[in-house]
Amino acid sequence: MKFIIKLFPEITIKSQSVRLRFIKILTGNIRNVLKNYDETLAVVRHWDHIEVRAKDENQRPAIRDALTRIPGIHHILEVEDVPFTSLHDIFEQTLPLWREALEGKTFCVRVKRRGKHEFTSIEVERYVGGGLNQHIETARVKLTDPDVTVNLEIENDRLLLVKGRYEGIGGFPIGTQEDVLSLISGGFDSGVSSYMLMRRGCRVHYCFFNLGGAAHEIGVRQVAHYLWNRFGSSHRVRFVAINFEPVVGEILEKVDDGQMGVVLKRMMVRAASKVAERYGVQALVTGEALGQVSSQTLTNLRLIDNVSDTLILRPLISHDKEHIIDLAREIGTEDFARTMPEYCGVISKSPTVKAVKAKIEAEEEHFDFSILDKVVEEASNIDIREIAQQTEETVVEVETVTGFGANDAILDIRSIDEQEDKPLKVEGVEVVSLPFYKLSTKFGDLDQSKTWLLWCERGVMSRLQALYLREQGFSNVKVYRP
């Protein structure tokens, strides 16, 4: 099989040296991503495209799908590479491949040609198009906005019959820009902002501030791993987790209620900047959007930025929530985000939207900064590939069931609001309500002689919580997916 990789247009307008560097990096990224699919795979770079050749036909769909998710690729062409001897030979090889697709449709032929030939590209289009029109009675030529476009590429004495065109995600190859550290919470915004920086050519590392216990961290780890595995697996990245509960406790005790949100964000930026400096990362990435919450006004954002010299990138600054959710749905993080607990929003009951620098600094004078230094020093740092290994090892231990036995009970772990809106009723089995955010403290109070089948609407949070309970030593948990 053969694929022709077309470059993102912004790469093609770079200077010769920069363009060659980008193409070289993209070629390496493709090799890194595809090496597990086919050991015989070959990746060859050219000035205006990259070729991927592989022998294992069973891997064709997987290779094609992986290529569409590598930053720097505008689109890929799945081609059949055959020799040709004449214009008529080109037509004869094109007819059987396209006959079925053209029946009852309007079409045109488009040819791209490289090398020296006795004919022009337009002459090939006319000859092949005329032949197809004659031999397929129900087909009709239409040069403007046809139903089907027959794409052919000719390179010296080889004919590339284009069997399919698949759009890539565009952007720059990862590694062409410097590393960044994304402050990831697992919600809609941080996942999308991380993706946008990967698409722009940055290797994205992840920093997670844990405010809600082990279950929250498990969920965020899986979001980070999903993003890396889907769009950035050509490079090794770090996942740094900082236990921020002591910092939150100090803020709740020492800081005025209205200033808590801004002070918390300032502490996060301070901590993330220390992590970035430790690993030589050039910038921080956040999912903040202007005016979305109280801490994201211009005044408050300026005060948050003031605590660090590290550049803070906010790719979503002008996006509205609906658009962000649409992007999350497009890249596949929507389900994760919908079931991710949000802890930051409950820290302050009456937050200020226009903080005063002197007042913020006065409040921070009460804060014990040794606590911040300690949590940064004790931060865990793992290779993101280890998350997959840990998850695979753990997932095997959590059984998913579609029915229930005599000693089983269903545990509805949705939030109270969701349960009131759509109560769960299952005949023949006891249904108990215990929201996910109470599992860590209340699950032990349940009847441990029963097997508890955790249930939520999408199955994401129930699986994460089952993993967490298993880690805590509870073996009587399964995931219920009818």
From Swiss-Prot:
Active site: 456
Pathway assigned to this chain's UniProt record: Cofactor biosynthesis; thiamine diphosphate biosynthesis
Superkingdom assignment: Bacteria
One GO term (biological process): tRNA 4-thiouridine biosynthesis
Cysteines engaged in disulfide bonds, as pairs: 344-456
Binding annotation for ATP: 183-184, 265, 287, 296
Record keywords: ATP-binding, Cytoplasm, Disulfide bond, Nucleotide-binding, Redox-active center, RNA-binding, Thiamine biosynthesis, Transferase, tRNA-binding
Segments forming domain Rhodanese: 404-482
Localization of this protein: Cytoplasm
Predominant location: cytoplasm
Record-level GO cellular component terms: cytosol
SUPFAM superfamilies on file: Adenine nucleotide alpha hydrolases-like (SSF52402), Rhodanese/Cell cycle control phosphatase (SSF52821), THUMP domain-like (SSF143437)
Role description: Catalyzes the ATP-dependent transfer of a sulfur to tRNA to produce 4-thiouridine in position 8 of tRNAs, which functions as a near-UV photosensor. Also catalyzes the transfer of sulfur to the sulfur carrier protein ThiS, forming ThiS-thiocarboxylate. This is a step in the synthesis of thiazole, in the thiamine biosynthesis pathway. The sulfur is donated as persulfide by IscS.
Record protein name field: tRNA sulfurtransferase
